[in-house]
Amino acid sequence: MLRASADYSVGMTDTASDAYSIPQESIDLRDMIRQISEEQIAPRAHDIDASAEYPWDIRKLLAENDILGLPFDTEYGGTGTGALMLNIAIEQIAMSCASSSLILMVQDLGTLPIRLFGSDEQKARFLPSCASGEKSPAFALSEPEAGSDPGAMRTTAKLDGDEWVINGSKNWITNAGVADFYVVMASTDRENRRIGAFIVEADREGVSIGKLEKKMGIKGSPTGSPVFDEVRIPKENVIGDPEKGLSVALGV
């Protein structure tokens, strides 16, 4: 089982060789993931891309080997081994299958808003199941008219009593259709260009998937358009201040 056992930070030192050295634990991890990738992921790469189907078996494989826990601290069931080891893992998987590497990349990106800006309750509620690989997230920012410009987005969130009501759609979202929840950026005050960040579970009424993109490559990682039609979420699903979501988007 992968767990932090040393300082994995790479700091500035007196020599260039030391500055770019990699800890032995990271080398061991690299070799372990390289073996898994070459022996079990690479043989599936062609079929994954040819079928354009999400590789659930690879996600299970990564979870069973603690690889999906790399982005997370130990208190949430992760490895606590830091960004260096995460990026080494992504690199090794991508060498065998780019689609499969995005499983780990999105596990990191989709939970980053919660890890950086979420409440303790939100972290406890959403992070352990992602660290174990039981659930997978998606980060929903880009829109057809706005691209990835948070200030121009048209998806809205309106407060109605104790709930927020989300309306709109997103484009080019990695993990669309397979994610268990979306971190959705939505306008809370269009006139003043205020936005918020909201955790929207995929099984909530009003959540659907519109278009799935037909891509030239990396076809096993779905890219699509989640649609939110009068989707109601509790106040507890707001990440931080509902009018300061721009800092969340830019921080990620």
Predicted regions and their residues:
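Long, well-ordered alpha-helical segments
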Residues: 33-40, 118-125, 161-167, 197-207, ...
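Internal helix-loop-helix
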Residues: 64-134, 174-181
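A short, Trp-centered hydrophobic/proline-enriched beta-strand micro-motif
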Residues: 133-141
